[in-house]
Amino acid sequence: MSEELLSQEEIEFLMETLEKKKVEKIPQGLQPFDFDSLEKISSERYPRLEQFLSTFTERLSEELKKITLSNLKVKVKEKDVKPLSKILPNLSPPVVFIRQHLEEVGDFTHC
């Protein structure tokens, strides 16, 4: 299934339509948006988006661990300090922040 990309003008038009539920003027060459097609679009795309976001969060978490732990090994060799107390508290907040942000967005398929 090939997906068609929207131009910036089309995106702005759709956003205006969604925000106002009506449009003052239709840009030249565009058709009014068919809200009935939203259900079909969301039913096809939402599972893929959900899968992407879950794998994205896992990958980001793993990358942060690699970066932080590799820096930790170097610091331990250079100095006789306990960097764990400084590094580990900072390991998860980016992942937690992304998860919280995505949860705030919620299930947009049932708008």
Swiss-Prot record:
Superkingdom in the source lineage: Bacteria
Q: What is this protein called?
A: Uncharacterized protein aq_1239
